[in-house]
């Protein structure tokens, strides 16, 4: 079985190495400026099954400085950045983040 349901997270077989905190797309790859399925919870190797947070708060990697309350979307590397459009967003920053190594809480 490739996908199972576990409350606020699901599992999905990933098609590439994905680090914890990066956005995952619906095909099991890194979400690169596209709508994300959720956030990878642990570092996962290509072909393995990754737990993906799809609901609630979690830590995410940021690709640029964000402020508490900013709407977030995935950038080209799967990191969260401030949304520049109201078209869609993945969640809100629950705290400030200043660089790509900072983890923030997102929903």
What do these predicted ranges mean?
Residues 1-107:
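Surface-exposed, low-hydrophobicity beta-strand/loop segments enriched in small/polar/acidic residues
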